[in-house]
Amino acid sequence: ISKIFSTGMSLGGFMSYRLACELNEINSVGSVTGSMSGYYQCNPPKKTSTIHFHGTADGVVPYDGVEWSLSARDAHAFWKTHNVCNSQTEINLPDFNGDGRITKRLISYDCEEEKSVELYSLEGEGHIWWNRSWGHDINTSELIWQFFKNQ
């Protein structure tokens, strides 16, 4: 096995981040509506690429964070700092379904060991797994797989 990836939704996303915080074998993490614990001090043993998807109206794991969970942007900032990423850009993705909601893609790149850190912020969206065939603007599964393949 040359590369190990971990992905999960909600608590599975928390688990994936925790694995990257503790295990040297994890190459990349994908988190959907999960974040990092506000109670746990993460000290990753190596650089790790991350991709994170979060709805801004998530009522289960709030986008802006709570005592027990970092905000989506704080989780992104943690991995950007850990991976020593020198550049960042944010773009709005096309509104394929025409609902007027914006998906923002925040990309941190030019990181050490060719790692990258991405955050998809889905305006007005809740605690779900996104799929274009269900009428959403993005397909989470495809984006995670493409991200992992490039790591």
Predicted feature residues:
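Conserved alpha/beta-hydrolase "acid-adjacent" motif
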Residues: 59-71
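Catalytic active-site module of serine/aspartate enzymes centered on a nucleophile-bearing elbow/loop
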Residues: 136-151
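Gly/Ser-rich "nucleophile elbow"/oxyanion-hole loop immediately N-terminal to the catalytic nucleophile
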Residues: 1-11, 94
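Short beta-strand/loop motif that positions the catalytic acidic residue
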Residues: 52-54, 58
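Acidic, glycine-rich loop-and-strand cores that form catalytic or ligand-binding grooves
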Residues: 68-100
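A conserved short beta-strand
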Residues: 25-35, 49
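Catalytic histidine-centered segment of alpha/beta-hydrolase-like enzymes
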Residues: 126-133
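Short glycine-enriched nucleophile-adjacent loop
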Residues: 13-24
